[in-house]
């Protein structure tokens, strides 16, 4: 199986710089996900093992006597790659971090929002993925990009149910997390063949996703994972939806800073912190969503 493979290995003693073992050390190879070792090491070296990413809830405008916020709620991203991740269930779901946000908003005396919930990813630029990534990869889970406001690993899951009698197309049974209305999933999966071969097509910020390929009739149910087109919007949508469940309704639909192209003076309300860097790397062995370490200065906003 490795007859035509290219292999390169180079190991040194970091204390003496002596070579321990090398095989084709100068060969040029595509590093793939092993490059995450470099970005993770850089993260720990520059930011430190006790660094915590912060996601901050802010608002602008004033809260009147009737509990109406005459302004917007903002989710200001701090580039936390673990926010809402399934790999950190205890940290983010005991209790659920979005419900914690809702309770903080309610405790502030806000009963209505004459404005919108706005996702703010401006810590990074709008380019989620490098220009060199293959277009056919971008809609899949391994094509998920990084941004100033990430959520749910920037991935959604689609549960399909197959037709055991091989008479029809597998149907979509459930999509998680909940899908915003403007995002459309087109199902072009068919039954046939001996192996599963499915691909998700779609670009960053594009609200149409096409799931295409074949699956064996023997698979009763199966999951397909895709990249979230606009994580900042999904964060705003998820909070807005949870607020409505608690009868706190916004007059405008959720949106993002990128969509609205503006910034308002915002007042800090609550911060959501990740685990320390060392725990993220050591305890969970998470594959970071960051394709590179971006460090930028962001001026402080007025705090309460």
Q: Predicted segment positions?
A:
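Short active-site loop at a secondary-structure junction
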Residues: 22-42
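Conserved serine DD-peptidase/penicillin-binding transpeptidase domain
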Residues: 45-304
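Beta-lactamase-like hydrolase cores
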Residues: 1-27, 54, 101-109
């Amino acid at each position: 199986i490795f007859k035509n493979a290219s292999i390169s290995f180079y190991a040194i003693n970091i204390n003496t710089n002596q070579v321990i073992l090398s095989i084709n050390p100068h060969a040029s190879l595509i590093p793939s996900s092993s490059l995450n070792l470099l970005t993770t090491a850089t993260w720990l070296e520059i930011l430190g093992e006790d660094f915590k990413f912060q996601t901050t809830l802010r608002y602008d405008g004033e809260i009147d006597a009737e509990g109406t916020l005459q302004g917007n709620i903002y989710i200001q991203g701090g580039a936390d790659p673990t926010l809402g991740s399934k790999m950190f269930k205890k940290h983010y779901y005991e209790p659920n971090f979005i419900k914690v946000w809702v309770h903080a908003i309610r405790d502030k005396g806000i009963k209505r929002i004459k404005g919108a919930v706005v996702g703010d990813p401006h810590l990074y630029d709008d380019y989620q993925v490098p220009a060199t990534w293959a277009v056919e990869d971008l809609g899949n889970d391994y094509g998920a990009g990084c941004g100033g406001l990430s959520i749910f690993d920037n991935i959604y899951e689609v549960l399909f149910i197959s037709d055991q009698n091989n008479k029809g197309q597998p149907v979509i049974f459930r999509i998680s997390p909940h899908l915003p209305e403007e995002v459309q999933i087109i199902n072009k999966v068919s039954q046939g063949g001996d192996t599963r071969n499915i691909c998700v097509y779609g670009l960053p910020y594009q609200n149409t996703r096409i799931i295409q390929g074949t699956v064996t009739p023997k698979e009763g149910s199966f999951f397909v994972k895709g990249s979230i087109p606009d994580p900042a919007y999904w964060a705003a949508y998820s909070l807005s939806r949870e607020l409505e469940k608690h009868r706190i309704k916004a007059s405008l639909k959720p949106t993002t800073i990128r969509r609205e192209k503006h910034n308002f003076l915002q007042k800090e309300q609550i911060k959501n912190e990740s685990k320390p860097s060392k725990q993220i790397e050591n305890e969970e062995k998470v594959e970071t969503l960051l394709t590179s370490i971006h460090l930028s200065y962001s001026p402080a906003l007025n705090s309460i």
